[in-house]
């Protein structure tokens, strides 16, 4: 019991909000998630990790590049928001650097984003706030039943744009992050990684 009390008392001091996502409304209704991502830096790997065998069925300690490579090889799956945050973590070359960055901006908070899906002829683009194609009045409640689609290919849409904050989705294991907006709240943009290519790099 003393060890458990110690664990609980240390946990809030070592973590900070890294991102917040509001899931887009599905056309058929169903469950919708309002998710916050937290970052916690530990000096040592926890001696024991357990899962509930429902939402979490297994665990694995990996660096962000290792996790992305496993995703690319279809060993594991990530939803686009998790992939985006892993690409952001690839900016940091050490745990110390990541912890300093997180601590320096801990009081800044983070902006809640809702993605909007644009269906192209050969894939999907998940648009985020600040992107050229992000709607001025997004459908936060799902009441408008708005569907964004085009006959253009993803490549054509990329050539036409200039301000990007998007994730291109060719299939569940082929994602690409494109970001050139100015980040808010002293945050950092993710590395632009395309799992369909083999030449992406990371500082880790």
Q: Model-flagged regions — what are they?
A:
Residues 1-85, 98-111, 153-157, 162, ...:
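Unchanged
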Residues 85, 89, 94-204:
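Core RNA-modification/binding signature centered on pseudouridine synthases
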């Amino acid at each position: 019991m003393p060890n458990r009390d110690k664990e609980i008392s240390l946990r809030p001091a070592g973590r900070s909000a890294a991102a917040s996502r509001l899931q887009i409304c599905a056309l058929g209704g169903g469950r919708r998630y309002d998710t916050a991502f937290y970052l916690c830096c530990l000096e040592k790997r926890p001696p024991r990790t357990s899962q509930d065998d429902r939402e979490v069925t297994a665990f694995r300690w990996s660096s962000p590049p290792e996790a992305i490579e496993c995703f690319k090889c279809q060993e594991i799956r990530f939803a686009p928001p998790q992939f985006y945050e892993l690409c952001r973590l690839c900016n940091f070359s050490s745990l110390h650097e990541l912890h300093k960055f997180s601590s320096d901006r801990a009081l800044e908070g983070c902006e809640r984003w809702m993605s909007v899906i644009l269906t192209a002829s050969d894939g999907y683009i998940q648009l985020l706030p600040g992107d050229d194609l992000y709607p001025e009045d997004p459908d936060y409640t799902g009441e408008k039943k708005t569907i964004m689609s085009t006959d253009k290919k993803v490549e054509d849409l990329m050539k036409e744009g200039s301000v990007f904050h998007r994730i291109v989705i060719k299939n569940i294991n082929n994602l690409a992050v494109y970001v050139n907006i100015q980040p808010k709240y002293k945050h950092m943009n993710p590395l632009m990684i395309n799992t369909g290519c083999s030449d992406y790099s990371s500082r880790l």
